[in-house]
Amino acid sequence: MSFRNFKMVDYVVFGRGAFNQLDEILAPRRKADAPMIFLVDHFFEGKPLVNRIPLRGKDKIIFADVTYEPKTTQVDALANELKESFGTVSGIIGIGGGSTMDLAKAVSLMMNNPGSSADYQGWDLVKFPGVYKAGIPTLSGTGAEVSRTTVLTGPTRKLGMNSDFTPFDQIVLDPELTKDAPVNQRFYTGMDCYIHCIESLEGTYLNEFSKSYGEKALELCQKVFVTKNHWDDESDDQLM
């Protein structure tokens, strides 16, 4: 039997207020005057969170419309715009929900891979690592911040760019960022996590390593959705 040697996120910081460390986290990843590009969920336009983003030099904030799942055309347009404006960038930082996470991962990959993102929809088709990328989720439960795929709607199909180059280099998990999320959105993405737990415990390809994650995640989901009759800060911590 052959076992898969799978890629995971390189660095993780977790805790309330962790977002405040973003500047020091990004500092060693900056390359000369090449900017950091912050892809931010359009929900946050005009909101206080934007003023906390640690901009330096040519850094740029781009508000991404993620009403619908990212499209390959959207990814290609953003990557081409950045190449034309800056040549290259120090990194792509995604701030938002699952669709924003996927968009940031895809744009990072397309900064260093030729053609269209549609060419890489599938399994292990990406040839080169992308530029540095960090994910900062503002919703819990999608799992997009830790997955090896980025789900895109292409010209002919909806499919992920699945590769070992896809996972983020860094994620910042700050439960405080989920506090102002709409209640229904919190519930939907939380149940997404709950269903992932069931899949990870009842699926076809199981092992004790993966089951240990599924069991603990299910326990935390049950604390949030079953044993409590109200939502509090601890719920945000547990779900993230």
Question: Where do the protein language model's features map onto the residues?
Answer:
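Active-site segments that bind and position negatively charged phosphate/pyrophosphate groups
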Residues: S200, T204-M240
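Predominant activation on well-ordered alpha-helical scaffold segments within soluble catalytic domains
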Residues: D23, D76-A79, K105-S108, M191-E199, ...
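Structural motif
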Residues: Y11, P35-I37, I61, S90-I93, ...
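ATP/NTP phosphate-donor binding region
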Residues: M1-G91
